[in-house]
Amino acid sequence: MSSSTDSTPIEDEIFSESRSLTFQMLLGSTADSLQLSRFELRVVRFFNDVCVPFMTYNVNKRHVYVWEKVIPRYFTSSSAIRSAVLAMGCLTIMPLCGLGSVLNDKLNADELTRELEAASETWKVQRVFADDHLFEGAKMDINLFTRASEYFGGALNGSNEALMKYQSPDRTKQEKVNYLNEASISNYLIYSFLALQPWKLIPLVSFAEDGYEPKNDLLNVAMGLKTIVFSDYDLLITSDIGDLFHADELHYVPPRKVKFVEDLKNQFNDYLGGISFFDISSEKSAFINDIRHCLLFLEKAFILSVKFNYPVNLYKWLVMISPQLVPYVREKNFFALRLLYAYACICIHVRLWSFEHSVWRDYIVWFRNKFWPLYEFDERLFHYVITKKRYVNDENFQTLKNFDVWSQEFDY
């Protein structure tokens, strides 16, 4: 059986450019007919030209078809998806405007917000939208950061509303499909936005301080996305967006060892070395099985990334294994924190960020400061991705098969 990442000549025809209500067609419409400003129409173009290729890599034709041909239909009818698309489009534009130059590790969330808002007022950013044909009437100032924040807030509100409508007991099956799809796509984009944004909107992990409730974090968002997707998985995967959430390729991964994951497996065995067989309680047994499940899925994600030069399963890993990993991170289990650290380093290496400053980098720096001195494996990872800034180049993810932390290129 072929995986959903493969395509056949028949699929090449089915998913060809000849079929379509696409973002390209939307972009050929007038702004007024879509009830968009001309600024928003340009943002949609950035989403189509940059975000969609980033999410599909033009490898999985089923995914390409959904993003290019199906999502535009929801864009015109769903305020949640429209806001999420516009938020992602704005975020995509920001690095192209040089906004990364104001980011600094020493700035907190409020300071970053002020810096990005002020930088977005400069002509260097404004000129991107200053074409004569772009604005009608009086001059309009576009603050890219403010717009991104507003659209993101709209996406959050819209996705919550769609989820409540889906959960209402008096909905028809078709209404439930529509609202489930709306909630799934908008939350998929919300998770992506939060993973990519650089201004500390939420951290990767937030631990409760004494006397305070824990703040929201990316782990919660990952678990929430998986909960939505699996609330009625059979209904979702048979819908017109179902191909985005099929995981059939994970069930047909060829057996192959991955050096990076083998190292983590060996370190987990070392971690368990001090536990006697007779001391293994049901809780410890569940922990061992859960971590091994996480490592197995990480191994599969690596193999598929190399085989298809397609890293999307690496991006999805945290969502997919969140029920198994997150509870132990919340308990501050050291190996769970280390595994998340290793994954964050991989996210940096494969460029799961819009700016070098990201939730992944923040967690890596926090972990290193918290548990200094690190194990040599962890320290070598830190210098490779943070100090040396060694990233995947030219979208050549097949280099992951040679990702060996003990090799000379990781020396520091």
Tell me what each language-model feature is:
Residues 102-106, 203, 358:
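Short sequence/structural elements of tandem HEAT/ARM alpha-solenoid repeats
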Residues 98, 134, 140, 144-228:
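Internal, conserved structured core segments that host functional sites
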